[in-house]
Amino acid sequence: MAYGRRYWRRRRWRRRGGRWWRRRRPWKTRWRRRRRRWRRRRYGRRARRFRRRHRVGRWRKLFRRVKSRVVRQWDPNVTRRCMINGYDHALFWGQQAQHRILYDNLPWPIKKEGTQEGGSMNMMQLTLQFLYKDNLAGRNRWTRSNWDMDLAKYHETTLLFPRHRNYSYVVFITRGPNDILDEHTYPGLHPEKMLGRRKKIVVWSKDLRPHGKNYIRVRVPPPQVFKNQWYFQRDICQMPILTLGFAAFDPVNVTLAGNMANSSIILWGIPYWSRPMPYNTWYDYWTKCAGPQNIPWSDRQTNIAAGITQKSAQTCLKLKNKHFGLTNTAIVSDYDKDNIDKNTKQIKTIVMSLNRWYPKWPMKWKDAGDINTQTPFPYRYSWREDQGWGNKVRLWTRECRTDIPEETLGIENMPLYVLMNGYIDYVTNHSTHSPLNWVVSVFCPYTDPPMTNVIPVGKDWFIQNVEPGENKYPSDNADNTFAPGEKTKIKNYDSSKDEFTGNVIRAPDVYDSLPAQQALYIASPFSLKWAQTTGSIVFFYQSKWTWGGDFPRQRPIIDPCNRPKWGGLPVTGYDETGLLLQNPEKAEARARGHLGDLRRGDLTKTALKRLMELTSTEEGSPQKKKRRDKEVRTTADLLRPEDVYCWMSPTPETPPKAGKTPESSFAETYDNHTKLAKRVKKEIHNQNRRHRLLLAHLRRERDRLLGHHLLR
């Protein structure tokens, strides 16, 4: 039946689902044009003329429909869905340990009484091996066992963050495969940096938000590198499925703590080297340029020694601006040779000079007979003045060197309180450098005075590590306490020490910079102040997995009278529900065949290559004899005895040795080559035996898989 140009009449039924880019309607109906409702004309008014306007749709470019790709994937014979439900410690910190980093993925050593533990910041990676260790510790429960299941498929993880009564914290979640922990990671865990992230989760405390839910639930899909396919458990057991970062913060006391008058703090430090301290001794500079305006101590009026004359200001200015060169390999003046360890080449008793450690440090006194230990240099710092650009924090070696000290793990161009956040914790827990052989060097132009290669220490560092010498300051002896000319004695006096200096017991190390890290954290924005002494925060998770394996569904029937009795202690892998768990890191399943390895009754090339790469140490591989070390053999060693004389080049005749005839020499040579031939034959036989074992293993796997396929 022809309709002429009205070609649209030929299709009486509409296209299934309408246009391909539209969603199909869930109901079945015919397309009818809705009639316009006409209102009844009122009397006394002129009828309004209505003109129907046909609606014209917007012009759209027609795209070709992209066909979906068909992915054909083999599934194992047996699959088991497993839900891993558990909890873990997000944050916990002891008294005055807010500035520390909680390393949850590291084994915790047993702490002594009074030692700081934990931290208010943490970063952890969830892996399949991490979930298995949590099960051994009793922190999660597996609904299905992975015993005899060599394959795994990851689906998702649901996280639940409960609200704490007193503390608020911020969380970030990443699914990238390149989330590595280095020296640049932990400065980003500072609360100010965490709150400035684009993607974050802020969990407010119940004191600030009394209403609302008591938890925040987050669903985390698989990482970008994970495909919806089966993996061997051993291959993905160490691959992070997600990375979590936690940081507790104080939204009430943002800038100042309860006992702080302003945002400025005092940092104490020792210069690693200083131009006013020449390469030979500090005493050299003292004698050449003395005076309160030239001595770099905080309390200059109390550092004037008797008997030292004041030099001109021009001489002092030249001495300050002089560029002192590096020392040679010889021992510096006023150094004791016994002060340097011959094995480690480190100086035992030290205080700094230019690229050298100087064992003597000036003391100061207030009155006759009263000696106070000199404090380190004070540096005033405020986070409001710190712009970040130009700051540097790095590790320097403590070795006695004649060149520029070795430098490593340097980070820069961030505020000082961000650079020092977690830096010492990273060095002591993650780096390969010993904290006792390195020092933390800080370069910050925003302090007063600027810190130029300064080692931050505590204020009482010299009190703990300096043994004072003898005070020779003249006394007026107003109360006739001392006899005329008598020297003032102090505690622990040693006549071998200098008369107006103290002897330093040891050098500073990485641990001595912890007071500076704590002071910077407490004075920084959004940090936990002194009022919050201890705290603990946990989170809950539910991870969804699927285990896969290839054992027959229909198990053979066994005589019950021949079944062995179960006795003895339970296996370690059992949990409280009786499930037998297997360590995914040690589950080597490459020696096992699967139904996906068969193609028309034979093994595929991929499966054959995987089985050929097995070694005798892997679980499930065919056992074979230990391989002997290959010996370097020449062509003559591989020849038969009867072919030796045909191949060997003629040699000059030599007289036979005493007691040996040509016939006996020939017999000895023949016996040696016969032994070589037997050894070569035995080696070839062993090699063929290994091939036969491998082929027999392949045939057994093929027959087993064919049998499982028929049982299905």
Curated annotation (Swiss-Prot):
GO CC terms, sorted: T=1 icosahedral viral capsid
Membrane-crossing residue ranges in chain numbering: none
Annotated region (Disordered), positions in chain: 614-633, 646-665
Pfam families assigned to the protein according to its UniProt record, in alphabetical order: TT_ORF1
Keywords, ordered alphabetically: Capsid protein, Coiled coil, T=1 icosahedral capsid protein, Virion
InterPro entries for this protein: TTvirus_Unk
Coiled coil: 670-706
Domain of life (superkingdom): Viruses
Subcellular location(s) per record: Virion
Family, as annotated: Belongs to the anelloviridae capsid protein family.
Known role: Self-assembles to form an icosahedral capsid with a T=1 symmetry, about 30 nm in diameter, and consisting of 60 capsid proteins. The capsid encapsulates the genomic DNA. Capsid protein is involved in attachment and entry into the host cell.
Protein name: Capsid protein
Record lineage: Viruses, Viruses incertae sedis, Anelloviridae, Epsilontorquevirus, Epsilontorquevirus calli1
